[in-house]
């Protein structure tokens, strides 16, 4: 009984509190559009009919869109005639209200500012509406766990954020783009050229091919099992974390954080992994490990999320959170792409991978940082004589090939040919580079250190 009373009271309070709106701004937009039809293209980029608080204003805006799509002008006569033919004129206050709208416009020059006001109020109303749904789901979870409720809340809030991001994007004038491009060129001109315009990978030959990892790029690293794709990606992350101030964020869906740290200590300390795993360390090993730990604790610029199950929305929200808290990121790495799940698309792996790929590319563009995503390869390449991977070997390759700016494959001949002359050598095959050449570079693979190094015949060690 108490719950019923509380619910009724909540409903009464909700009715007393008017949702945020600006009827004056809505009226000024509609009146301004009747006076200046050319403003439609600017306004329709910012708001839609659902952004209006007044149902009458939604109806008028929808009718304006209909008339303009038909090639008709919108004014008092055409608008009232069209509404009357559909029997809707009386719902909006008839001709008199339309006349009042066009008469009371402060200025058509400020119409885009009015649209910003209407959109802002609309966004707040959407947040309130979603908050109420989350509260309702909390009172009546219908079997949902607390984690499922959190995922629901997160996805709904993120959907609003995405809508807002899309409204802020759109065509840019060539003058604006030229200004941005020229500023970038001047920045590069005034910076001593070292063959790198993006993020330094730590690998000289790879930098020469790619000019570094570029902002907003989606980078796919793919290989068959045991080739070292996690090691290679982690080495890039380590190199960047040691060089740049802004942190690196790692999503490790396959390995635990402790396993990642064990590999990192082996790699950076040059201490054999087997020694670390068994604890059979000598004084020199301990000295190296201690030195590495001190450096890592001093830098403190790497985050590892080892959640074994993540959705695109969870990954996106966690990335944004770390980005905001640190005023930026240098890089995001995902190990590996096929382990991410899209609940609404489970059962259709092709569509699921396409959605994951789209999200990662969108996030890279939004945060303006490179994102590395590891991917599996199809088993079918094992049937070929030459087992060096190509783009079509990517699992669910269509969307990955399309969205990726850079695709790199790892091939180590020693895994297929025991007596090869290429022992300890890894080929990094660039299968796609949107703004650069494709080709192959060599790196030295020191597996016992969990490390790829710049290629040199003298650098390989099997100790």
Swiss-Prot record:
The keyword Iron-sulfur does not apply. Residues 192-459 form the SF4 helicase domain. The keyword ATP-binding applies. Keywords: ATP-binding, DNA replication, DNA-binding, Helicase, Hydrolase, Isomerase, Nucleotide-binding, Primosome. It is an enzyme of class 5 (isomerase). Gene3D superfamilies: DNAb Helicase, Chain A (1.10.860.10), P-loop containing nucleotide triphosphate hydrolases (3.40.50.300). Signal peptide: none annotated. It comes from the Bacteria. GO terms for biological process: DNA replication, synthesis of primer. GO terms for cellular component: cytosol; primosome complex. InterPro entries: DNA_heli_DnaB-like_N_sf (IPR036185), DNA_helicase_DnaB (IPR007692), DNA_helicase_DnaB-like_C (IPR007694), DNA_helicase_DnaB-like_N (IPR007693), DNA_helicase_N/primase_C (IPR016136), P-loop_NTPase (IPR027417). It catalyses: Couples ATP hydrolysis with the unwinding of duplex DNA at the replication fork by translocating in the 5'-3' direction. This creates two antiparallel DNA single strands (ssDNA). The leading ssDNA polymer is the template for DNA polymerase III holoenzyme which synthesizes a continuous strand; ATP + H2O = ADP + phosphate + H(+). It holds the Pfam family DnaB. Its EC number is 5.6.2.3. One of its GO terms (molecular function) is DNA helicase activity. ATP binds at residues 223-230. Homohexamer. Belongs to the helicase family. DnaB subfamily. PANTHER family: REPLICATIVE DNA HELICASE, REPLICATIVE DNA HELICASE DNAB. The main replicative DNA helicase, it participates in initiation and elongation during chromosome replication. Travels ahead of the DNA replisome, separating dsDNA into templates for DNA synthesis. A processive ATP-dependent 5'-3' DNA helicase it has DNA-dependent ATPase activity. This is Replicative DNA helicase DnaB.
């Amino acid at each position: 009984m108490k719950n019923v009373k509380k619910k009724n009271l909540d409903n009464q309070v909700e009715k007393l509190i008017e949702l945020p709106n600006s009827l004056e701004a809505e009226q000024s937009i509609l009146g301004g559009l009747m006076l200046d039809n050319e403003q439609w293209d600017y306004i329709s980029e910012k708001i839609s009919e659902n952004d209006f608080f007044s149902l009458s204003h939604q109806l008028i805006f929808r009718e304006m869109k209909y008339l303009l799509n038909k090639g008709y002008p919108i004014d008092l006569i055409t608008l009232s005639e069209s509404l009357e033919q559909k029997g809707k004129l009386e719902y909006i206050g008839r001709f008199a209200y339309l006349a009042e709208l066009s008469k009371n416009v402060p200025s058509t020059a400020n119409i885009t500012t009015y649209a910003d006001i209407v959109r802002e109020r609309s966004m707040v109303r959407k947040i309130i509406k979603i908050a109420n749904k989350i509260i309702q789901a909390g009172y009546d979870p219908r079997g949902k766990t607390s984690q499922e409720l959190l995922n629901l809340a997160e996805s709904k809030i993120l959907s609003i954020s995405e809508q807002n991001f899309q409204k802020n994007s759109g065509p840019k004038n060539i003058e604006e783009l030229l200004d941005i491009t020229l500023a970038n060129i001047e920045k590069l001109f005034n910076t001593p050229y070292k063959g790198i315009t993006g993020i330094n990978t730590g690998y000289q030959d790879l930098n020469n091919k790619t000019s570094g990892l570029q902002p907003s790029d989606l980078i796919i690293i793919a290989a068959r099992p045991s080739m070292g794709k996690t090691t290679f990606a982690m080495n890039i992350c380590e190199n960047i974390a040691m060089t740049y101030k802004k942190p690196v964020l790692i999503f490790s869906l396959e390995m635990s954080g402790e396993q990642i740290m064990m590999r990192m200590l082996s790699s950076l300390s040059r201490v054999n992994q087997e020694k670390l795993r068994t604890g059979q360390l000598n004084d020199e090993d301990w000295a190296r490990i201690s030195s590495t730990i001190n450096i890592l604790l001093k830098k403190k610029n790497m985050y590892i999320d080892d959640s074994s199950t993540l959705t695109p929305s969870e990954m996106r929200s966690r990335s944004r959170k770390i980005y905001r808290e640190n005023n930026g990121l240098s890089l995001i790495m995902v190990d590996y792409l096929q382990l991410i799940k899209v609940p609404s698309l489970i059962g259709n792996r092709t569509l699921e991978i396409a959605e994951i790929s789209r999200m990662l590319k969108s996030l890279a563009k939004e945060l303006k940082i490179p994102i590395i995503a590891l991917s599996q390869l199809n088993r079918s390449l094992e049937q070929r004589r030459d087992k060096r991977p190509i783009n079509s070997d990517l699992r669910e390759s269509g969307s990955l090939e399309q969205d990726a700016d850079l695709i790199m494959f790892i091939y180590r001949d020693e895994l297929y040919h025991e007596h090869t002359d290429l022992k300890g050598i890894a080929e990094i095959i660039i299968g796609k580079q949107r703004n650069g050449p494709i080709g192959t570079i060599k790196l030295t693979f020191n597996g016992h250190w969990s490390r790829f190094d710049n290629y040199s015949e003298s650098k390989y060690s099997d100790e």
